[in-house]
Amino acid sequence: MNNHFKCIGIVGHPRHPTALTTHEMLYRWLCAKGYEVIVEQQIAHELQLKNVKTGTLAEIGQLADLAVVVGGDGNMLGAARTLARYDIKVIGINRGNLGFLTDLDPDNAQQQLADVLEGHYIIEKRFLLEAQVCQQDCQKRISTAINEVVLHPGKVAHMIEFEVYIDEIFAFSQRSDGLIISTPTGSTAYSLSAGGPILTPSLDAITLVPMFPHTLSARPLVINSSSTIRLRFSHRRNDLEISCDSQIALPIQEGEDVLIRRCDYHLNLIHPKDYSYFNTLSTKLGWSKKLF
């Protein structure tokens, strides 16, 4: 065992059969190599592991040096929103579909992870967004997002009228089905499917991408990540929502605004030493190969 990581947490999809196989392999392999291992409680229950140290995501974030997330990007997003609050590094083994965030190959995970555990890795600091639904002199409802914060109707799709302020200065008004506010990490997710630009992970930028706008002049906008975005609504209604990473929904009540800003903390995402962001884009999006 080396000195780069001493305590490793295992988290991810607790009920997917192939993911559970990877969880079990990972647990036994890490224990055999002498690491202290903490297994997320639900995973330990599904695997029927005995005499194993278990913990919640928050406890793993507090105690472990590295968290290995087994699953797809959705599992990574769910875990990362909690783990980003702590001084812990995170890496993913892909048991999902695209795998933009979980980039270890499950068939070669042992060797790739062995190299990482020896200190052969690169680290990226991915920032999060914080969304607040608030009314003057009232308690705020707050959530965070790794990928994006989305304004949308709560149930049936319909047009929304709203104003966008950037650093408390009016920027534009819009009539559309919603708005996607994305980090660079999320620029290859929902934002991309709505026509937004791809941002490299190190950019300090946020994108605002309209969803089915009712005018051809509405275009994606890229702003500095230090800016604060305020959304105000022309017709007070009780059927609007803000969703974070398509996993957490915050309802917007009459008279409330939405504030979106960069989080004070970030996700320490690590990759194998040979990781290339542009190679990942080319592979996942089916870009053309080199000509010569």
UniProtKB/Swiss-Prot annotation:
<feature type="binding site">
    <location>
        <position position="158"/>
    </location>
    <ligand>
        <name>NAD(+)</name>
    </ligand>
</feature>
<dbReference type="Pfam" id="PF20143">
    <property type="entry name" value="NAD_kinase_C"/>
</dbReference>
<keyword id="KW-0520">NAD</keyword>
<dbReference type="GO" id="GO:0046872">
    <property type="term" value="F:metal ion binding"/>
</dbReference>
<keyword id="KW-0547">Nucleotide-binding</keyword>
<dbReference type="InterPro" id="IPR017438">
    <property type="entry name" value="ATP-NAD_kinase_N"/>
</dbReference>
<keyword id="KW-0963">Cytoplasm</keyword>
<comment type="similarity">
    <text>Belongs to the NAD kinase family.</text>
</comment>
<dbReference type="GO" id="GO:0003951">
    <property type="term" value="F:NAD+ kinase activity"/>
</dbReference>
<dbReference type="GO" id="GO:0051287">
    <property type="term" value="F:NAD binding"/>
</dbReference>
<keyword id="KW-0418">Kinase</keyword>
<keyword id="KW-0808">Transferase</keyword>
<feature type="active site" description="Proton acceptor">
    <location>
        <position position="73"/>
    </location>
</feature>
<dbReference type="GO" id="GO:0006741">
    <property type="term" value="P:NADP biosynthetic process"/>
</dbReference>
<feature type="binding site">
    <location>
        <begin position="188"/>
        <end position="193"/>
    </location>
    <ligand>
        <name>NAD(+)</name>
    </ligand>
</feature>
<feature type="binding site">
    <location>
        <position position="175"/>
    </location>
    <ligand>
        <name>NAD(+)</name>
    </ligand>
</feature>
<protein>
    <recommendedName>
        <fullName>NAD kinase</fullName>
        <ecNumber>2.7.1.23</ecNumber>
    </recommendedName>
</protein>
<feature type="binding site">
    <location>
        <begin position="73"/>
        <end position="74"/>
    </location>
    <ligand>
        <name>NAD(+)</name>
    </ligand>
</feature>
<feature type="binding site">
    <location>
        <position position="247"/>
    </location>
    <ligand>
        <name>NAD(+)</name>
    </ligand>
</feature>
<dbReference type="Pfam" id="PF01513">
    <property type="entry name" value="NAD_kinase"/>
</dbReference>
<keyword id="KW-0067">ATP-binding</keyword>
<dbReference type="GO" id="GO:0019674">
    <property type="term" value="P:NAD metabolic process"/>
</dbReference>
<dbReference type="GO" id="GO:0005737">
    <property type="term" value="C:cytoplasm"/>
</dbReference>
<dbReference type="InterPro" id="IPR016064">
    <property type="entry name" value="NAD/diacylglycerol_kinase_sf"/>
</dbReference>
<comment type="function">
    <text>Involved in the regulation of the intracellular balance of NAD and NADP, and is a key enzyme in the biosynthesis of NADP. Catalyzes specifically the phosphorylation on 2'-hydroxyl of the adenosine moiety of NAD to yield NADP.</text>
</comment>
<dbReference type="InterPro" id="IPR002504">
    <property type="entry name" value="NADK"/>
</dbReference>
<dbReference type="GO" id="GO:0005524">
    <property type="term" value="F:ATP binding"/>
</dbReference>
<feature type="binding site">
    <location>
        <position position="177"/>
    </location>
    <ligand>
        <name>NAD(+)</name>
    </ligand>
</feature>
<dbReference type="InterPro" id="IPR017437">
    <property type="entry name" value="ATP-NAD_kinase_PpnK-typ_C"/>
</dbReference>
<feature type="binding site">
    <location>
        <begin position="147"/>
        <end position="148"/>
    </location>
    <ligand>
        <name>NAD(+)</name>
    </ligand>
</feature>
<keyword id="KW-0521">NADP</keyword>
